[in-house]
A protein has these predicted regions:
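Beta-barrel outer-membrane channel/assembly domains of diderm bacteria
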Residues: 3-133, 355-359, 371, 387-404, ...
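Transmembrane beta-strand segments that form the barrel wall of outer-membrane beta-barrel proteins
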Residues: 34-38, 126-141, 166-172, 200, ...
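Surface-exposed coil loops of outer-membrane beta-barrel proteins
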Residues: 89-108, 125-204, 213, 218-220, ...
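Residues that define the transmembrane beta-barrel architecture of outer-membrane proteins
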Residues: 49-55, 109-113, 148-152, 194-198, ...
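Membrane-embedded beta-strands of outer-membrane beta-barrel proteins
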Residues: 59, 115, 154, 166, ...
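C-terminal structural cap/anchor segments
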Residues: 297-385, 393-395
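Repeated loop/turn-to-beta-strand initiation elements of outer-membrane beta-barrel proteins
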Residues: 68-71, 123-127, 163-167, 175, ...
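Outer-membrane beta-barrel translocator/channel fold
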Residues: 82-84, 167-187, 239-335, 413-433
Length: 442
């Protein structure tokens, strides 16, 4: 039994004695979510293609808080995945969709259970456990496959000051979206894990239309990072608006970074000091909304010294030197797209998207979008070769049933095409078909 599971069991025993307290039960929520997913990745340049289908279930119980100056509560999450289709030839080992057995074939099923104990004092909440899913500029939990990525540690959120939300925490382990095992934390290329990711920051809503953000984070022995953000929405009319969203990251090396086992692969691109973190990246997006139409245009620049860095446990190995299978990560840049990230040294990316909400045409719940990204000026890994380029086109259609017995049932179809010039990533065509449904008990 790991530490987080033990903590949840102890907490449940203590809180069960107060289960009758107003709020703990009355404010509880429980739901069961189902996700069926078909994943098809066609490597156009050769190599093993991936074609798999799987069924996932996720049960969430979120209690209220007990009475008193300090209220206590408990959250529990149980998830399970079942492999439906895709033989060994269509299941690349160490992928982030379905875990692998020792012979490289897909595991038929996997599951995990974890939870968080929580406390509330005034407008401040603390959560401690192994089912944390942060969504912050310096860390975004990934939920783009069958089951969600989760983290183990502690977080604090405070809204004691009007219009300001403070966030702080320390995380020690992660569980990948295609794994039931927890690992330490690392970056792309790092095989040795770190058990300390600390962060603190705030979102300040200066006016109802303007929000400023600052966050600092540190992954011990890998990197330190500062983030600055600005979000402004200009309401033009009742059904028109113009949104500005600007993000800036400044990242540098920490501790053992650069040593054997702690090297950052700089996303497969150039690095002024190989293995070390040294990066500044800014990204800006502008969105004009008119009724159900949304037109997005943006630009992003990664400096020449190294690639953009973020938490990524894809290369962490176990005691036998075998990958833990904890790959798959998200990051807080607009270029975190369906297939690629556009975050190598020197890369300049221009991107645009058009989306439409069909509610205005009498079809509520139906949405569609198409996006295109083009990155160039990517520095060659040796720093002296010709600059490289890449592009990606993503399309998406979503429909959610609005009423009746199947209210909330959703279908998503996504298709992405990626092509690169002299890039060490294979050209890919990718399709995902996803069915989602959540039933709420409470």
């Amino acid at each position: 039994m790991n530490k987080s599971t033990l903590a949840v069991a102890v907490a449940f025993g203590v809180l069960a004695q107060q289960a009758g307290a107003a709020g703990f039960i009355e404010d509880s929520k429980a739901s069961l979510s189902s996700r069926t997913m078909y994943f098809n990745n066609d490597n156009r340049d050769g190599g093993a293609d991936q074609r798999e289908a799987a069924q996932g279930f996720k049960f969430d119980y979120l209690s209220g808080f007990t009475q008193g100056t300090v209220g206590f509560g408990l959250d529990v999450q149980a998830i399970s995945g079942i492999h439906l289709d895709g033989g060994r030839g269509h299941h690349p080992d160490n992928n982030s969709f379905n875990p692998s057995d020792s012979d490289g074939s897909a595991t038929q099923s996997w599951s995990r259970i974890a939870g968080n104990v929580k406390a509330r004092l005034s407008k401040t909440e603390a959560h401690l456990g192994g089912a944390l899913q942060p969504s912050l500029p310096i860390l975004v939990a990934n939920d783009s496959r069958l089951l969600p990525q989760t983290f183990e540690g502690g977080t604090i959120t405070s809204k004691e000051i009007d219009n300001v939300t403070f966030n702080a925490g320390q995380l020690e382990h992660a569980v990948g979206r295609a794994s039931s095992n927890s690992t330490g934390l690392a970056v792309a290329g790092g095989t040795q894990d770190s058990n300390q990711f600390r962060y603190a920051g705030a979102d300040w809503k200066v006016t109802k239309d303007l929000t400023l953000q600052y966050y600092h984070s540190n992954l011990q022995d890998y990197y330190k990072q500062n983030f600055f953000g600005l979000v402004h929405v200009f309401p033009i009319d009742t059904n028109q608006s113009f949104k500005t969203d600007i993000r800036y990251f400044d990242s540098s090396s920490d501790g053992k970074n650069g040593d054997a086992g702690y090297r950052f692969n700089n996303n497969g691109g150039y690095a002024k000091t190989p293995g070390e973190v040294d990066n500044k990246t800014w990204s800006a997006m502008f969105t004009y909304t008119l009724g159900g139409n949304a037109f997005l245009l943006g630009h992003q620049r990664v400096n020449d010294d190294g690639g953009f860095v973020y938490l990524n446990q894809g290369n962490v190995v176990d005691g036998n030197g075998r990958p833990e299978g904890a790959g798959g990560a998200s990051f807080y840049l607009f270029t975190d797209s369906m297939i690629n990230g556009f975050v190598r040294a020197g890369e300049n990316t221009t991107f645009g998207q058009y989306s439409y909400d069909f509610a205005g045409l009498g079809v509520p719940g139906l949405k569609a979008s198409i996006a295109y990204l083009h990155g160039d000026n990517i520095k060659a890994t040796n720093g002296t070769g010709s600059d490289m380029s890449e592009w990606e086109r993503d399309m998406r259609i979503d429909y959610t049933v609005q009423q009746g017995t199947l209210k909330g049932f959703g279908v998503t179809l996504r298709n992405g095409v990626y092509r690169g010039s002299q890039i060490n990533i294979a050209d890919q065509d990718q399709t995902r078909l996803i069915f989602n449904y959540t039933y709420s008990f409470l």
